[in-house]
């Protein structure tokens, strides 16, 4: 597949990108190069190759789920100018 100047201008218009004639000509070559590389990739035999998300093997670090109340309410409301029974008190702004 090759991209011509009209296709580049049409895609730029659809993407709402202002492209000058010189830029469109340059992009035509660049897009054709990219598409050529993609065509090369489609020729690679990947039968039997498992999909991967990274080139390095990675394992997710897992932790045990421990239910806790946090016990930080007093520390949190200590920063508030006004509080009552671990609730923030704020001035009334809406009638």
Swiss-Prot record:
Does the entry annotate any disulfide bonds, and if so which pairs? none
Q: What is its EC number?
A: 6.3.5.-
* Reactions it catalyzes: L-glutamyl-tRNA(Gln) + L-glutamine + ATP + H2O = L-glutaminyl-tRNA(Gln) + L-glutamate + ADP + phosphate + H(+); L-aspartyl-tRNA(Asn) + L-glutamine + ATP + H2O = L-asparaginyl-tRNA(Asn) + L-glutamate + ADP + phosphate + 2 H(+)
Q: Provide the top EC class.
A: ligase
Family matches, as InterPro entries: Asp/Glu-ADT_sf_sub_c, GatC
- Its Gene Ontology biological processes? glutaminyl-tRNAGln biosynthesis via transamidation; regulation of translational fidelity; translation
Q: Name one GO molecular function term.
A: glutaminyl-tRNA synthase (glutamine-hydrolyzing) activity
Cited Pfam families: GatC
Recorded hits in Gene3D superfamilies, A to Z, give: Glu-tRNAGln amidotransferase C subunit, N-terminal domain (1.10.20.60)
Where does the record place a coiled coil? none
Instruction: List UniProt keywords, sorted A-Z.
Output: ATP-binding, Ligase, Nucleotide-binding, Protein biosynthesis
Tell me, in a sentence or two, what this protein's role is.
Allows the formation of correctly charged Asn-tRNA(Asn) or Gln-tRNA(Gln) through the transamidation of misacylated Asp-tRNA(Asn) or Glu-tRNA(Gln) in organisms which lack either or both of asparaginyl-tRNA or glutaminyl-tRNA synthetases. The reaction takes place in the presence of glutamine and ATP through an activated phospho-Asp-tRNA(Asn) or phospho-Glu-tRNA(Gln).
What's the subunit arrangement here?
Answer: Heterotrimer of A, B and C subunits.
Q: Which family does it belong to?
A: Belongs to the GatC family.
Name assigned to this protein: Glutamyl-tRNA(Gln) amidotransferase subunit C
Name its species.
Answer: Rhizobium meliloti (strain 1021) (Ensifer meliloti)
* Gene name, Swiss-Prot/TrEMBL: gatC
